[in-house]
Amino acid sequence: MTATAQQLEFLKQNIKTIPDYPKPGILFRDVTSLLEKPDAYALSIELLAARYRAAGITKVVGTEARGFLFGAPVALALGVGFVPVRKPGKLPRATLAESYALEYGTDTLEIHQDAIDANDRVLMVDDLLATGGTIEATTRLIRRLGGVVHDAAFIIDLPALGGEARLEAMNINCYSLVSFDGH
């Protein structure tokens, strides 16, 4: 199934825009409003899964927390394992950590050391691509474990924030179902 313009517009219409959240001047794209509509949520999962069904994906990685909401069902639809990437101290087995820069300070993500096998073909899934920092750190974790990143897939892209260019500089192909102008 290839996404039609009508399907993508349907998804876009089911993502609410909240002005001045979390601070003045920001237009927050609320993907949780899409989750409230079973037909829109199911369509988003099916469109992502359909795109990657023949790609030889062996693992889907989702980043905390909304990446879990889309990554796990995509993994299930593809018949492959799902691997969560989380904030420090949230995973019970031995982990690998990767820190990355934020606008003010740093953050860290962790993955189980045994979650990705050498040469696993990995699809990363998250709800939104903004600056790309989270997915850049996730890519470094996957590569440190020997995995091969096939693509990074998102529900929403905010092109003005430069995330896709940042990830393409790391040889990461990006795919988003919808994009919104602004930030």
Swiss-Prot record:
GO molecular-function terms, A-Z: adenine binding; adenine phosphoribosyltransferase activity; AMP binding
Pfam families listed in its UniProt record: Pribosyltran (PF00156)
Entries under SUPFAM superfamilies matching the protein: PRTase-like
PROSITE patterns, A to Z: PUR_PYR_PR_TRANSFER
Gene3D superfamilies: 3.40.50.2020
Pathway: Purine metabolism; AMP biosynthesis via salvage pathway; AMP from adenine: step 1/1
Cell compartment(s), UniProt: Cytoplasm
Signal peptide limits: none
GO CC, any one term: cytoplasm
Xref: InterPro entries: Ade_phspho_trans, PRibTrfase_dom, PRTase-like, UPRTase/APRTase
Annotated catalysed reactions: AMP + diphosphate = 5-phospho-alpha-D-ribose 1-diphosphate + adenine
Root EC class: transferase
GO biological process, one term: AMP salvage
Subunit structure: Homodimer.
UniProt similarity note: Belongs to the purine/pyrimidine phosphoribosyltransferase family.
Protein purpose: Catalyzes a salvage reaction resulting in the formation of AMP, that is energically less costly than de novo synthesis.
Protein's name according to its UniProt entry: Adenine phosphoribosyltransferase
Protein encoded by which gene: apt
